[in-house]
Amino acid sequence: DLLERTSENLHMMAKDAAGFLAEESLKPGSPFNLGIPREAIEYATVSLDRDDPSLYSRFDLIYSGNDGRPPRMLEYNADTPTGLVEAALIQWYWHEDVHLKAGVTGIDQWNGIHEELIAQWGRIDDHLGRLHGLRPHMYHFAYTDADDSGEDLMTTGYLMDTAIQAGLTSTLVEMKQLGLDRETARFTDGKNRH
């Protein structure tokens, strides 16, 4: 519970900081100018003001759990794939191997990443429905084949699977198959689907 509360508070603080930096960076001569194009800052500001949902984020915290000191943040990554498969799936398999197969009961995996991703897809779909008056008919999950390790494809495939489990129609597409429909100003996949 402490780690979840701390993470929620840190996430809210990060959003507040992003709003502050976005506002300040638009002021002439501001020392907080990050060199981000004005249009991108304005889009981010609208998104922050609307409280658009994000899919997931990851904190790197330092916390011993037994010295009375609160958790402290080392790093924050939002909507980036690093470590997602390991945290959501491999930790579950470790839990099964160490506890369940040994007959230990009453202990659950301490994170609920997989379940929360599925729930968050539902919230995102609802948000897009309210925002645009309709829900997307298909979610496209794009990956690059330039990643020799396969991590990008594995992570993208996993995220797509969680969206499917949330009841969303989804497809996997290579980045190089993405195009732009100039008439509708919408992105398309290799099959010319929006």
Language model features by range: what are they?
Residues 46-80:
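Conserved metal-phosphate-binding beta-hairpin within the catalytic cores
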Residues 1-5, 75, 99-104:
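Charged, low-complexity surface segments at secondary-structure and domain boundaries
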Residues 1-43, 138:
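Low-complexity, highly charged intrinsically disordered N-terminal segments
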Residues 62-68, 80-194:
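Domain-scale recognition of functional cores that engage charged ligands
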Residues 8, 12-15, 19-26, 46, ...:
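Generic surface-pattern signal
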Residues 43-47, 145:
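Short secondary-structure boundary micro-motifs
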